[in-house]
Amino acid sequence: MLIYACVSGHGYGHGSRVASVLLALAARQPHWRLVISSSLSAEFLSGAFGAVPFEHRRCGWDVGAVQANALGIDAPATLLALAELERRLPDQIAAEASWLAEQGGRALLLGDVPPAAASLAA
């Protein structure tokens, strides 16, 4: 079984939460293949998963909010980032759907926040 997790790259909380779920799955089903699709860094994911093997497909599924500083949001930059995401998402979804089909067998999609994950599952 392939587990494909679309994870928001906006902050480490999403990655930590998904890692906890997937680590619990791996403990019960160690032969399952774990794939993390996220813009989170490989270093962060390696730390979160430890010795549990996983694959990282570097995809950005959402923008969250672009920070102006530690406490503020840069609304214009967030809107620009969202427009760019909406422009490239159709190609990304098509490419990831094709990749998933090439893997053969069943796949379970998990999404932590990105609504576009539902389009990939369709």
Features from the language model and the residues they span:
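Conserved nucleotide-sugar phosphate-binding/catalytic loop shared by glycosyltransferases and other
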Residues: 32-89
